[in-house]
Regions:
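Catalytic cores of alpha/beta
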Residues: 82-94
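N-terminal glycine-rich anion-binding loops that anchor highly charged ligand groups
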Residues: 3-11, 30-48, 53-60
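Short, well-ordered coil/turn segments that N-cap beta-strands
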Residues: 4-7, 41-43, 71-77, 94-96, ...
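Active-site mouth loops of central-metabolism enzymes
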Residues: 9-31, 75-84, 109-115
């Protein structure tokens, strides 16, 4: 179909699906889950969050999960980062894309990342500067 729209699918389950559950999934199970998602044809997966393990123990192994995901041919590996420190760790681990939560409402921003929208926009500028310095293009 020459005029068919392009649809971009970005799977976030390994991050969003795990961050609010109490039980910590093993690293091996996370890697198997990502393998299955990639085998199903997904080409972009948000595999975790680079956040302090004391806040989200489910994400304590995110660098290892990124390392595994990077071995899958053709997979774009994404991770959520709440700030410059998280972005530094994510880039060091080898992610291809970063996502940063900038909320539409002040209340959600404070509940989600304990920062105002203005503070998150400042974080976004810092993350962009870091990305431009370390991984331009």
């Amino acid at each position: 179909m020459p005029n068919a729209p392009q649809v971009h699918i970005s799977e976030v389950g390994p991050r969003d699906g795990l961050q609010s559950v109490q039980t910590v999934m093993s690293t091996a199970d996370k890697c198997r889950w990502i393998d299955a998602l990639a085998a199903a044809g997904l080409r972009e997966i948000e595999v975790g969050s680079f956040v302090p393990a004391r806040l989200l123990p489910q994400m304590a192994d995110v660098a290892e999960v990124v390392g595994h995901a990077r071995t899958l041919p053709g997979l774009c590996v994404m991770a959520l980062v709440p700030n410059r420190r998280g972005a530094q760790a994510a880039l060091a681990a080898g992610v291809h894309k970063l996502t940063l939560p900038v909320s539409a409402s002040e209340a959600h921003s404070l509940a989600n990342v304990r920062k105002t929208r203005g503070q998150m926009l400042a974080e976004l500028r810092e993350v962009i500067a870091l990305r431009n310095a370390e991984a331009p293009g």
